[in-house]
């Protein structure tokens, strides 16, 4: 089992100074506190990064980016043009050497036009983004990441922290090394993984789902689309599926020292197979493909879910 974490570079290079005279006062300034509002083109990018602290972004119906930011010790670098707004922590001294240890906590409160693309990064800090209704890339090395109302492509990643994503109208990648992952109300493909933590996927309408964890449980409560592909892998945890009645899928189940249980009779039909630690069987018309693999955990399949929006808050 391989869990791939894309760790983006968390130190953002300063953008080139702007030449627009009306925005000149907002460009390339180093400050300890920023309270400003700038215009952003429709579909523009908001790029925020810090070393330690908190980032909070909310979407609104104005064509402006409003920023309220401060830092306890150090300086903030702010750049803006009509298509991109950037805010980062200046972590180099006059000689160009990095000085992470001398930089204090920063706090960003930012409102963005709906439809903006967000790039949010923290070394040690929590990230929250809601209501932007655009693409989102959110990454924290040590901190929790929570995103809602993203569209098209959404990525939420952490190394040490929990990841939560909800109300995503598009594809989602949610990953962490040490922490739990929860995805809720997603309408695109889902890729969710954790090394040391549980993975929960609830109320999704997805044609392709891939989940992986090493030492945690996997819970999936959602639809199985005809012709869809679904994969669930855990080394030492339980895999639990809550799927609607009438689901049609071919199941491939593999477990070394765990057991398999379902709320329906498992019948090995023609073309299916069963051997020690592995079985294949069909439910309904068998159009979807479902793969479940665990080394020392249980596999539980429940078709008692009466809707695709059923929640599992156990």
Language-model segments: residues:
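Intrinsically disordered, low-complexity terminal regions
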Residues: 1-314
